[in-house]
Amino acid sequence: LLPERDSVSESTLRGRMMVKQLGIAYEEFNIAPVLDALGCYRWRDDAIRAVFPDYGVGWKNKIVISGGQTGHFNYFKLVVQSPNGEVFDQRLDSKNYLQIVAATNFKQRVRKTLEYFHADRLNYAVVGTPNRVEYDQGFFVKNGDGSADIKPIAHLYKTQVYALARYLKLPEDICNAQPTTDTYSMAQGQDEFYYALPYDKMDVALLAYNSGASTAALAEALGIGVDQAQFIYSDIEAKRKTTAMLHWPGIPIEPVIGPNNKPPILG
């Protein structure tokens, strides 16, 4: 369990509940000092202050997505909350958006580094967490939460993951928890940051798309207009294209051939 400065306590509590329920040995380590030393929070806050100069101690933040269901290009907004509860939002330019995301991605990558440390010392494999929608739509960090030796739920839609949790008799607090990135200091659902649809509707949309269902069929299933259904399909296609490189392995400049003209691992 690897919380940090912006993690909500409920996530750590649910993690403890799950490992105890399943009888899994675990360690708990706060990675905030590591992130601080790497400059994670400093780089992030510098970019936030470029948009909101007053941002400082006691403020909170998150990034939200807009545009995908209306036919417009997706764009991201920075939302901040002052210590007295006032909320402000502003559309992000590319430079500051990329810096905030790059700094935030330290969190997933530091966690994965620690996972592989323990895997190495115990001679274990690292198990990944992306579900089908996350894997298909590129909602993971390359060499972060997207890195694993085995990905046992990458073929399961989110609703199926919830069903699996109930089959395993995990506590209801876990089974009823809403998906969250738990990455930003303000409460943020995955639909706010990436999908622009609640997870259950996103499951239906991706299943419909993968099954070749018409936009009219998707519109009927979700209770929306055909135009909006087409926007959702277009957004699915766009995310597949723009995140394809997250799935790419490292590419050698020259072919590395082993016996029988096959890559060494297959020779």
Go through the PLM ranges and name each one:
Residues 6, 17-34, 38-107, 113-125, ...:
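ATP/NTP-dependent adenylation/nucleotidyl-transfer catalytic domains that generate, transfer
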Residues 9-13:
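Conserved strand-to-helix beginnings and helix N-cap segments that scaffold or border functional pockets
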Residues 1-5:
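Short, proline-centered helix/strand-breaking motifs
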